[in-house]
């Protein structure tokens, strides 16, 4: 689930700081995506956070490092502007209620600081301006408004149309999955995890119960994944590697051992339980509608390219900082 709403926006909220400080150069256009301009304050936010994560704040960048960071920034800004362009396509905008929510969010964050100086001091720590914070926070609300427009246009069933919602959940787009998942936290423990996954698979092939092996080997707890019912998922909700295996299977079939960025997996595709789906209709339809949103989102994302402006080409990315003008 490394997608737009639960990825980039969740990371933003985890930052938890904003700033009122801004300068006119912050709105200079560094790049263009799909006909939309990318302002310095946005590009800089991604560039400096990516630098912090990969190399550290004080690292001296060479040409290869700058190129890698600019590539990552390209993916970041394509994410944001794919949403903006999709919203325009559907006529989705932030409402007055949304603006009020953003005002409340900003005021709540301001209250975390002893005074205005402390509030402003957060700027250099997290590479944000208040304007950009509002924009990034508003993206989550905007995405929900796009989903609402998809329902209004009939591309998704209305929430209260339970017959159509149930039909959507019964479709092959959604799968019920049980999973033996063996997590490894570091490269040093990878071989241990692989051996455990292979041992579980060997016992599975010898006729032992998938559910019993889930309980014995899986890194999931019963609270995270209901062992008896499994979990319901779709493309763009499941990990890419997991969904690639699940969609190959018919109900009752299981995969071999495969690896994702999070560990080793064996998945079993199960028959869906109508009673369980009815009981959890709202939760499952939320997964369904968001996955269909991502389907449209990434279809547009894949058409976009990032082009640097003349101003962006002249920026000294090795020395880029919050004081950049």
List where the protein language model places each region.
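Residues at alpha-helix boundaries and the short loops/turns that link adjacent helices
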Residues: 77-81, 116, 140, 144, ...
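PPIase-associated folding chaperone regions across multiple families
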Residues: 33, 61, 121-192, 215, ...
């Amino acid at each position: 689930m490394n997608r737009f709403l639960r990825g980039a926006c969740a990371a933003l909220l985890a930052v938890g700081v904003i700033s009122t400080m801004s300068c006119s150069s912050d709105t200079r256009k560094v790049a263009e995506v799909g006909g939309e301009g990318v302002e310095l304050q946005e590009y800089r936010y991604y560039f400096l956070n990516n630098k912090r994560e990969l190399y550290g704040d004080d690292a001296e960048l060479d040409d290869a490092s700058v190129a890698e960071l600019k590539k990552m920034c390209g993916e970041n800004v394509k994410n944001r502007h794919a949403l903006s362009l999709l919203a325009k396509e559907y006529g989705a905008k932030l409402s007055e209620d949304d603006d009020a929510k953003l005002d409340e969010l900003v005021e709540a964050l301001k209250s975390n600081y002893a005074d205005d100086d402390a509030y402003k001091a957060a700027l250099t720590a997290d590479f944000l301006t208040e304007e950009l914070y509002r924009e990034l926070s508003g993206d989550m609300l905007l995405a929900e408004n796009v989903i609402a427009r998809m329902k209004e246009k009939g591309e998704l069933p209305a929430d209260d149309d339970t017959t159509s919602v149930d039909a959507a959940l019964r479709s092959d787009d959604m799968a019920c999955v049980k999973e033996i998942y063996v997590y490894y936290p570091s490269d040093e423990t990878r071989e241990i995890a692989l051996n455990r996954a292979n041992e579980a698979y060997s016992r599975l092939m010898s006729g032992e119960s998938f559910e019993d092996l889930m309980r014995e080997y899986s890194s999931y707890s019963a609270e995270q994944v209901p062992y008896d019912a499994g979990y319901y998922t779709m493309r763009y909700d499941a990990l890419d590697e997991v969904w690639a295996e699940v969609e190959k299977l018919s109900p009752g079939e299981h995969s071999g051992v495969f690896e994702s960025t999070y560990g080793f997996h064996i998945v079993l595709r199960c028959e869906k339980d109508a009673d369980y789906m009815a009981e959890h209709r709202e939760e499952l339809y939320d997964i369904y509608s968001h996955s269909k949103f991502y389907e449209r989102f990434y279809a547009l994302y894949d058409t976009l390219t990032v082009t640097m402006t003349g101003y962006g080409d002249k920026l000294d990315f090795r020395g880029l900082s919050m004081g950049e003008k």
